[in-house]
């Protein structure tokens, strides 16, 4: 029982509104909250293959007392038998909350292990409404591995889904079976989990002894087998027997014998090596940050220039500088280039600004004094930043020579490499790379949108990235303007150099919310750890090969992805093809990342994943990771939108969903000639149609007129966003605040704030007297119902009437003496707090319409806010699109043809 006092906010005293009111369903649906979804008892489907398998299992089970057939792990006994008896779909989905793999095995009297499989639990999607969105918080289906394939069975022997996820946790043995399923086969990879490398770092092998297969070059891992009395090891990727170096059983500190099973690489599927000299072409370079700052009239007027300078001053000491070799340079840009020459602190306190007026043939004056040591020049950099803020505060130049600035910066640091961080409020309009405003009228929302508005306007922005990749340079963009800046063209710079684009439309530094968002994201970006001179390769065992790559990097060869610098907040998707029939019971993937750290070390991060193989289509479907599938389809849709059209991207999403549903019906559903034909799918896939339906309503793909900068930015973000953020972006989280539990808003034993349960993304569940918090991954909307009682308004906002609620872009003020206000603020802070992303979510306060109003009534700003917030109701008929039920009805009709 909670000790926190809960205040109950009664429903306002009013009658039901007239039917058909825009945006709200006036008759509330009792008992349709997601937590109250009616689950049916599972009825496993029986295919010929499965029938044979079940008969075999039944015979074996007669002699066993602890046989488990339904794959509901007992995580208190991780290496013992599982529970008996049939389980509900809800229990089937209730995997270990940490998402670790299932290594349980049931053993017969003779000691022979019996292969476990995930069972199919079919549901009717149309009877399973509203969709059970709690599934979005579940880990992937268990990976069923026998402990005897690992040298040291443990939950660390196979890679965590935090690092790598496969769309299929049971891999078809043949390409024909894969094609038959119509399911995508891909890996979703996130090499780093935190912005700071010191947080939960994986085990490190510092011995510089690296054991690799001499044929396929995979690294020894927990699934390698020691053979011939331990003198050799068999590669689990290509099956080659390799010699084991004598040092493998010796301590690197002394000559004592060590237990090889205690070695880091044998116990851990995710680990790092300190790389020996043969992995180094040149000594690890120092970290170099070059800031290209717009000082034109636009940047001065909207406050971006001052915001940048103030943030840099505060964050200089927090730039990664572990080895005291970090360097910095600053280039100010308008119609000319203004490069800062800063002396060491112990030499002089006077800096110079070197002006380069010839932007067609820019030269670099005094190059040795333009890229300076942060440790030796920190005080003078601070002084210079304060001085230039005064010098440029009344600049009237309207030009912005970005192209010449980029070329100059590339010459400055090209011998070493590093980061170019561009902060701009203007469309480049001087020198090479000048851009023109594109005419969006009559083009936006048509089939010509991609080719005329979302394409690269100037080839410079693609060819320059090739030069940057050769010289190990990454480009990041911070674009903040209330006017057109051609995100579609500029975003090519980060896309092919492993960078990121940050976009702040309508930026105004005098608005504290705008200022906080920019400064927070800019600060987190420049202070997060990064890797230099990085390459990443994914290997598959015999028969498996990487075939396509998605993300922000430069693809150097057929399977090698190059990152001039690797950030900590991006993920990558690699498609997998089955080249030859897989003859083994298990297959393997290994991701290797070779990198240089800010501490001067060269390292190799190795991530190894083992998956079972199968010839059963039912087992393949039972092991699909629906969120990983959603990530892969999103990448293909982004590629289609950029190369073809938005319409084609939506068609791809819809066709892929239809193909999966049709295949499931054809291969796994027993034909029922009588009664209504249901739209069947397995429980582990039941949220995928919802995600695909919502994805088509995302700003990146929705039909209609969308400003091209916003569309291009949305597409760019989807290219690199990790799964967790991707799902929130596709299907926003809506928290019901007015009736949240007593403990919500307070911290738990781990220090995290307890969040309310989410409700479905539909206005049907939005009470007109309620308070809701909407999180779409980029922004937060605090929605207060138009009929909210005065007590709620007083407790949350400190005002007695709706007319006094501060609508718009505002942070929620603290109300003295109100515990409820404190809890709401704590929840908002929790949703903004994350050490794995640089995103800071701006809060918008929105008041809903009263009983006699519609969405469009009120001020223009309020009506726009309501419509923007309402885009989160993806299950409804928003923006002239189908509701989720209508979408399923359409799918059912197509499947039944």
From Swiss-Prot:
Region span, Zinc finger-like: 213-238
Pfam families: Gelsolin, Sec23_BS, Sec23_helical, Sec23_trunk, zf-Sec23_Sec24
Membrane topology per record: Peripheral membrane protein
Keywords noted in UniProt: Cytoplasm, Cytoplasmic vesicle, Endoplasmic reticulum, ER-Golgi transport, Golgi apparatus, Membrane, Metal-binding, Protein transport, Transport, Zinc
Any single Gene Ontology cellular-component annotation: endoplasmic reticulum exit site
One GO molecular-function entry: SNARE binding
Main location: cytoplasm
GO BP terms, alphabetized: COPII-coated vesicle cargo loading; intracellular protein transport
Binding of Zn(2+), residues: 213, 216, 235, 238
Localization, UniProt: Cytoplasm; Cytoplasmic vesicle, COPII-coated vesicle membrane; Endoplasmic reticulum membrane; Golgi apparatus membrane
Domain of life: Eukaryota
InterPro entries: ADF-H/Gelsolin-like_dom_sf (IPR029006), Gelsolin-like_dom (IPR007123), Gelsolin-like_dom_sf (IPR036180), Sec23/24_helical_dom (IPR006900), Sec23/24_helical_dom_sf (IPR036175), Sec23/24_trunk_dom (IPR006896), Sec23_24_beta_S (IPR012990), SEC23_SEC24_subfamily (IPR050550)
Subunit relationships: The COPII coat is composed of at least 5 proteins: the SEC23/24 complex, the SEC13/31 complex, and the protein SAR1. Golgi apparatus membrane; Peripheral membrane protein; Cytoplasmic side.
Record's function text: Component of the coat protein complex II (COPII) which promotes the formation of transport vesicles from the endoplasmic reticulum (ER). The coat has two main functions, the physical deformation of the endoplasmic reticulum membrane into vesicles and the selection of cargo molecules.
Record-stated family: Belongs to the SEC23/SEC24 family. SEC24 subfamily.
Protein name: Protein transport protein SEC24-1
Organism encoding this protein: Candida glabrata (strain ATCC 2001 / BCRC 20586 / JCM 3761 / NBRC 0622 / NRRL Y-65 / CBS 138) (Yeast)
């Amino acid at each position: 029982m909670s000790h926190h006092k809960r205040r109950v906010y009664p429903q306002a005293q009013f009658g039901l509104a007239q039917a058909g009111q825009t945006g709200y369903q006036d008759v509330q649906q009792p008992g349709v909250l997601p937590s109250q979804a009616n689950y049916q008892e599972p009825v496993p489907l029986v295919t010929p293959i499965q029938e044979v398998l079940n008969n075999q299992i039944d015979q074996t089970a007669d002699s066993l007392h602890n046989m488990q057939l339904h794959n509901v792990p007992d995580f208190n006994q991780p290496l013992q038998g599982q529970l008996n008896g049939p389980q509900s779909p809800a229990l089937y989905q209730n995997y270990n909350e940490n998402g670790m793999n299932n290594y349980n095995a049931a053993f017969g009297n003779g000691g022979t292990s019996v292969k476990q499989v995930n069972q199919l639990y079919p549901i009717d999607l149309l009877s399973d409404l509203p969709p059970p969105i709690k599934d979005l918080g579940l880990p992937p289906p268990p990976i069923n591995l026998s402990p005897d394939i690992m040298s040291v069975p443990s939950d660390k022997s196979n890679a965590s889904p935090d690092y790598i996820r496969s769309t299929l946790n049971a891999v078809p043995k043949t390409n024909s079976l894969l094609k038959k399923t119509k399911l995508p086969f891909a890996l979703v990879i996130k090499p780093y989990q935190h912005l700071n490398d010191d947080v939960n770092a994986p085990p490190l092998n510092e011995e510089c002894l690296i054991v690799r297969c001499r044929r396929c070059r995979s690294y020894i891992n927990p699934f390698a087998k020691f053979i011939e009395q331990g003198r050799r090891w068999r590669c689990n990727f290509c099956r080659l027997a390799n010699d084991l170096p004598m040092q493998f059983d010796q301590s690197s500190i002394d000559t004592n014998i060590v237990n090889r099973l205690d070695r880091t690489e044998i116990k851990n599927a995710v680990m790092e090596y300190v790389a020996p000299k043969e992995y180094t072409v040149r000594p690890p370079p120092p970290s170099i940050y070059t800031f290209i700052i717009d000082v034109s009239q636009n940047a001065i007027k909207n406050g971006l220039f001052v915001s940048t300078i103030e943030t840099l001053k505060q964050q200089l000491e927090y730039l990664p500088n572990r080895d005291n070799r970090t360097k910095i340079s600053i280039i100010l840009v308008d119609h000319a280039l203004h490069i800062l020459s800063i002396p060491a602190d112990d030499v002089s306190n006077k800096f110079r600004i070197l002006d380069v007026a010839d932007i067609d043939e820019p030269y670099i004056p005094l190059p040795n004094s333009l890229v300076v040591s942060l440790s030796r020049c920190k005080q003078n950099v601070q002084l210079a930043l304060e001085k230039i803020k005064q010098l440029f505060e009344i600049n009237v130049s309207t030009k912005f020579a970005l192209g010449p600035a980029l070329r100059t910066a590339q010459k400055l640091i090209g011998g070493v490499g590093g980061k170019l961080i561009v902060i701009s409020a203007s469309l480049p309009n001087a020198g090479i790379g000048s851009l023109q405003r594109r005419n969006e009228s009559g083009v936006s929302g048509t089939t010509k949108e991609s080719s005329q508005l979302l394409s690269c306007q100037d080839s410079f922005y693609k060819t320059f990235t090739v030069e940057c990749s050769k010289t190990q340079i990454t480009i990041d963009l911070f674009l903040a303007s209330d006017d057109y800046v051609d995100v579609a063209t500029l975003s090519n710079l980060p896309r092919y150099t492993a960078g990121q684009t940050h976009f702040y439309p309508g930026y105004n530094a005098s608005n504290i919310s705008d200022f906080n968002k920019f400064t927070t994201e800019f600060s987190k970006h420049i202070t997060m750890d990064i890797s230099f001179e990085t390459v990443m390769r994914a290997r598959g065992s015999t028969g498996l090969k990487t075939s396509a790559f998605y993300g922000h990097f430069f693809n150097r060869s057929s399977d090698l992805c190059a990152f001039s610098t690797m950030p900590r907040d991006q993920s990558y998707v690699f498609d997998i093809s089955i080249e030859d029939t897989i003859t083994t019971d298990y297959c393997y993937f290994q991701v290797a990342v070779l990198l240089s750290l800010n501490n001067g070390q060269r390292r190799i991060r190795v991530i190894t994943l083992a998956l079972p193989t199968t010839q059963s289509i039912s087992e393949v479907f039972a092991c699909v990771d629906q969120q990983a599938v959603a990530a892969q389809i999103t990448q293909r849709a982004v590629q289609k939108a950029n190369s073809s059209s938005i319409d084609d991207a939506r068609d791809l999403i819809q066709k892929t969903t239809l193909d999966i549903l049709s295949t499931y019906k054809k291969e796994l559903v027993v034909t029922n000639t009588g009664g209504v034909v249901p739209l069947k799918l397995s429980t582990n896939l039941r949220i995928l149609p919802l995600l695909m339906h919502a994805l088509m309503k995302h700003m990146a793909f929705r039909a209609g007129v969308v400003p091209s900068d916003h569309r291009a930015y949305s597409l760019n973000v989807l290219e690199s966003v990790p799964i967790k953020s991707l799902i929130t972006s596709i299907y926003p989280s809506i928290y019901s605040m007015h009736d949240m539990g007593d403990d919500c808003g307070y911290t738990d034993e781990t220090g995290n704030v307890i969040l309310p349960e989410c409700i479905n993304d539909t206005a049907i569940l939005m009470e007109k007297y309620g308070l809701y918090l909407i999180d779409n991954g980029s922004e937060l909307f605090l929605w207060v119902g138009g009929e909210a009682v005065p007590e709620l308004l007083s407790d949350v906002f400190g005002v007695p009437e709706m007319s006094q609620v501060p609508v718009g872009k505002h942070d929620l003020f603290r109300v003295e003496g109100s515990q409820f206000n404190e809890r709401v603020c704590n929840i908002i802070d929790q949703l903004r707090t994350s050490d794995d992303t640089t995103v800071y979510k701006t809060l918008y306060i929105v008041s809903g319409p009263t009983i006699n109003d519609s969405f469009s009534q009120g001020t223009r700003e309020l009506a726009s806010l309501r419509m923007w917030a309402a885009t989160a109701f993806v299950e409804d008929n928003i923006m002239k699109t189908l509701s989720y039920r209508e979408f399923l009805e359409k799918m059912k009709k197509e499947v039944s043809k």
